[in-house]
């Protein structure tokens, strides 16, 4: 009888200890979740939506073709260099303003994923990353890393140029400065004419990839 009582007491003790361990583990899991401060980093493509139905809302921008940007190798690139045989989708991100913008990396990820569809429509893409000074050039690497993570499937390169607008010269020429830059999208035809210009008022205020493809389809359907 004593042995039976002793065994029962031992079992209850082990069960109690197990319950304490499980409770501690669960509490640890709860604490390991993201804090409110980290929540912005968790915004993913599925959580971000851009506009399918948009109309041009901005002036074409004087001298847009001859704006000069710099790629990661230090080579100067102008929009003029990319037209002629192709249309051009020119996209301005917000740039580096103390953090990597999740909306910008998500949008650029969408351009990477849908680049084949854009290319099939006879078009090239140029993404501009504005920075205030040359010392911030390394932030482009951080931006691209965030973009590749969102793209998934082992993506490590972009199929189109991503360039720096050092000193916000292009941003100021187009009148799109706000903090750094307002989100802006320009579509140029093969002749260099701006056929669509959209400047957003917030980070999510951009034409969706669907809207861009629709604009490119319009160009493709034109005679000549």
Task: Report the location of each language-model feature.
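Structural micro-motif
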Residues: 157-161, 176-186
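C-terminal motif of bacterial Sec signal peptides marking the signal peptidase cleavage site
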Residues: 26-28
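Bacterial N-terminal signal peptides that target proteins for export
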Residues: 3-18
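Structural microenvironment flanking redox-active thiols in thiol-disulfide oxidoreductases
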Residues: 100-156, 168-172
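Short active-site neighborhood of thiol/selenol oxidoreductases, capturing the structured segment around
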Residues: 79-109
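N-terminal "domain-start" segment that seeds a small globular fold
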Residues: 36-80, 106, 110
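Thiol-/selenol-based redox modules, centered on thioredoxin-like
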Residues: 181-224
């Amino acid at each position: 009888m004593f042995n039976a009582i002793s065994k029962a007491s031992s079992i209850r003790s082990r069960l109690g200890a197990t319950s304490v361990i499980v409770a501690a583990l669960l509490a640890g899991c709860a604490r390991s979740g993201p804090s409110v401060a980290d929540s912005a980093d968790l915004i993913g493509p599925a959580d971000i939506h851009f506009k399918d139905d948009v109309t041009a809302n901005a002036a074409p921008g004087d001298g847009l073709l001859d704006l000069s940007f710099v790629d990661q190798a230090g080579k100067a690139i102008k929009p003029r260099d990319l037209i002629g045989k192709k249309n051009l989708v020119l996209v301005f991100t917000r740039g580096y303003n103390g953090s990597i913008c999740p909306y910008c990396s998500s949008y650029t990820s969408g351009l990477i994923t849908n680049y084949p569809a854009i290319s099939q429509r006879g078009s090239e893409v140029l993404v501009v990353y504005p920075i205030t000074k040359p010392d911030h050039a390394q932030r482009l690497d951080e931006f691209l890393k965030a973009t590749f993570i969102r793209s998934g499937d082992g993506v490590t390169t972009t199929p189109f140029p991503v360039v720096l607008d050092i000193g916000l010269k292009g941003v100021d020429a187009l009148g799109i400065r706000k903090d750094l830059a307002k989100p802006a999208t320009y579509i140029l035809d093969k002749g260099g004419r701006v056929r669509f210009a959209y400047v957003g008022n917030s980070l999510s205020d951009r034409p969706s990839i669907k809207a861009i493809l629709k604009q490119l389809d319009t160009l493709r359907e034109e005679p000549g």
